[in-house]
């Protein structure tokens, strides 16, 4: 049953992000073979990664293509992925199966799906941004302090600005309770900004309010 759920989830994620086909990293565009400033190179995959906490309590893990694949002349898709309740970033990325693994490692596999997209859809730079609330619940995080929705908006704008030299746009994605991140972003904006090209809910639209959000999506 867990394997079936994993396969269904993978199909949903790939469909959601492929359906339609401010500080900066650098003052000059990266050419293929160049390193993104401030990023570490994963010794196993070669992917470029940046991990940090954006106050208050937003754990961010950015996974960008390897030096040889990142092309500053191509547009950059920033796929923001708000984690489901109770899940860690490591679980969400996934890993090769080993005996004794926690089963959570094998139900999302966003890391493998990202690599698949990079290998098959080469018209852009695929950058996956994992967004984990320190409370492991975006709903709880939003209620933990004032102006939290505007902090979500600020976080999205910061990430966009970080890649401003590379023709970026934002694609908002969420799984389960991660939908609260998207609703917080929508609540903080009077209309959906033009830099957001797609919004996807993977079983995460529990708090949907048609009057509150419907018109914003129609615009």
Explain the meaning of each model-derived region.
Residues 174-178, 182:
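Gly/Ala-rich beta-loop-alpha elbow adjacent to hydrolase catalytic centers
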Residues 21-78:
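A domain-start/cap signature at the N-terminus of enzymes
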Residues 111, 130-165:
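Alpha/beta-hydrolase active-site loop
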Residues 8-16:
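Bacterial N-terminal signal peptides
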Residues 184-188:
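Active-site signature of alpha/beta-hydrolase-fold catalytic machinery across serine-
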Residues 1-8:
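Bacterial N-terminal signal peptides that target proteins for export
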Residues 190-219:
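The feature captures the conserved acid-bearing segment of alpha/beta-hydrolase catalytic domains
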Residues 55-61, 66-123:
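Short, surface-exposed "cap/lid" segments of acyl-processing enzymes
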């Amino acid at each position: 049953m867990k394997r079936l759920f994993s396969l269904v989830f993978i199909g949903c994620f790939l469909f959601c992000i492929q359906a339609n086909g401010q500080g900066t990293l650098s003052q000059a565009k990266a050419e293929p073979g160049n390193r993104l400033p401030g990023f570490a190179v994963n010794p196993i995959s070669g992917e470029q990664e940046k991990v940090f906490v954006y106050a208050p309590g937003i754990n961010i893990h950015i996974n960008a293509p390897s030096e040889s694949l990142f092309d500053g002349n191509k547009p950059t898709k920033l796929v923001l992925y708000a984690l489901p309740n109770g899940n860690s970033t490591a679980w969400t990325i996934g890993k090769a199966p080993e005996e004794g693994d926690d089963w959570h490692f094998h139900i999302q596999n966003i890391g493998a799906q990202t690599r698949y997209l990079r290998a098959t859809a080469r018209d852009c730079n695929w950058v996956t941004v994992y967004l984990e609330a320190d409370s492991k619940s975006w709903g709880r995080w939003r209620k933990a302090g004032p102006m939290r929705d505007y902090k979500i908006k600020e976080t999205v704008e910061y990430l966009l600005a970080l890649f401003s030299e590379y023709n970026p746009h934002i694609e908002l994605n969420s799984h389960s309770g991660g939908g609260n991140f998207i609703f917080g972003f929508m609540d903080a904006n009077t209309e959906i900004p033009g830099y957001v090209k797609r919004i996807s809910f993977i079983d995460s639209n529990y708090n949907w309010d048609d009057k509150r959000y419907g018109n914003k999506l129609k615009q």
